[in-house]
């Protein structure tokens, strides 16, 4: 896949960006370079390759050292909700904005 200068102009327009011609050319080069890299990665035969959770796991046996899931701060819900204009059953009440 490769983009053209008109594709870059359209994307910039959709993003509400104004790109100078040199910026547009640079973006075209960078994005097409990215797409080339993706195509090269897609072409690699990965049949039989086991997915890795961590890249170092391919060369050595690692055990992830995860910390215990413990609350590090006290529950200050009531104190935090004192300044709220409306609270119900421990939840902040906000105006409906989507019909």
From Swiss-Prot:
Enzyme class, spelled out: ligase
Molecular function terms from GO: asparaginyl-tRNA synthase (glutamine-hydrolyzing) activity; ATP binding; glutaminyl-tRNA synthase (glutamine-hydrolyzing) activity
EC code(s) of this entry: 6.3.5.-
Domain of life, per lineage: Bacteria
Classification via Pfam families: GatC
Catalysed conversion reaction: L-glutamyl-tRNA(Gln) + L-glutamine + ATP + H2O = L-glutaminyl-tRNA(Gln) + L-glutamate + ADP + phosphate + H(+); L-aspartyl-tRNA(Asn) + L-glutamine + ATP + H2O = L-asparaginyl-tRNA(Asn) + L-glutamate + ADP + phosphate + 2 H(+)
The UniProt record lists the keyword Ligase: yes
Assigned keywords, A-Z: ATP-binding, Ligase, Nucleotide-binding, Protein biosynthesis
Summary of subunit composition and partner proteins: Heterotrimer of A, B and C subunits.
PANTHER family: GLUTAMYL-TRNA(GLN) AMIDOTRANSFERASE SUBUNIT C, MITOCHONDRIAL
Record family assignment: Belongs to the GatC family.
Classification via NCBIfam families: gatC
Function: Allows the formation of correctly charged Asn-tRNA(Asn) or Gln-tRNA(Gln) through the transamidation of misacylated Asp-tRNA(Asn) or Glu-tRNA(Gln) in organisms which lack either or both of asparaginyl-tRNA or glutaminyl-tRNA synthetases. The reaction takes place in the presence of glutamine and ATP through an activated phospho-Asp-tRNA(Asn) or phospho-Glu-tRNA(Gln).
Protein name: Aspartyl/glutamyl-tRNA(Asn/Gln) amidotransferase subunit C
Record lineage: Bacteria, Pseudomonadati, Pseudomonadota, Betaproteobacteria, Burkholderiales
